[in-house]
Regions:
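Core catalytic lobe of class I
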Residues: 1-191
């Protein structure tokens, strides 16, 4: 995960469970203030244990240049984990979804955001990642959901959304598409 040189940032925890615990605490506040018939749409990708990630020095991303390489080499190795090994896919999305479910959220759906134009990855020992999870969570078993407003042209929308990342004139490879929050907001609100 990217490091922004802020002691209070999320994502630099030693273990994924610590990250999930912090996010769970934050999202329980969302649960507290959400209307009883409201929906909470959570987009989260996964990470590999021991990955040293990128760095942001306050002005520039130095993920892939020579400085970024030096930075990654200087970062401390993660502390030993009870079962995750270096290069293991951590499983953060499902850890978080199940943690929220245990705390009282209704886990209604796991939507796959398929990215037809995924960010390039410099890996040779696995396939490149091209999807993220979007979890639909609610406070109550009955909630507002307008399936018609997000329907596809000829059918009800499925749980795999093929949506390109957005384009950007600047050097940013993973711009979040506005279509995803638009669909979530439209499906979950009456206005």
């Amino acid at each position: 995960l990217r490091d922004y040189d802020d002691a209070d940032q999320l994502g630099q925890e030693d273990h994924p469970e610590e990250f999930v615990e912090k996010l769970t605490e934050i999202f329980m506040e969302v649960h507290r203030v959400l209307k009883d018939d409201g929906t909470f749409w959570l987009n989260i990708g996964d990470t590999y244990f021991g990955a040293k990630g990128g760095h942001f020095d306050g002005a520039n991303s130095i993920t892939n240049d020579g400085t970024g390489t030096k930075y990654r080499e200087s970062r401390k190795a993660p502390s030993k984990h009870p079962y995750l090994k270096t290069k293991d896919l951590s499983g953060v999305p499902w850890m978080l979804a199940l943690s929220l479910q245990k705390k009282g959220w209704y886990l209604r759906q796991d939507i796959i955001w398929h990215k037809p134009n995924p960010m390039p990855e410099a890996v040779n020992d696995r396939c490149a990642k091209s999807y993220e999870h979007i979890f639909l969570l609610t406070k109550k078993p009955q909630y507002y959901f307008n399936a018609e407003v997000i329907a596809e042209e000829t059918r009800r929308r499925t749980d795999v959304w093929s949506i390109n990342t957005a384009s950007c004139k600047e050097a940013h490879f993973a711009v979040f598409p506005t279509k995803i929050p638009e669909m979530c907001i439209n499906a979950g609100t009456k206005e």
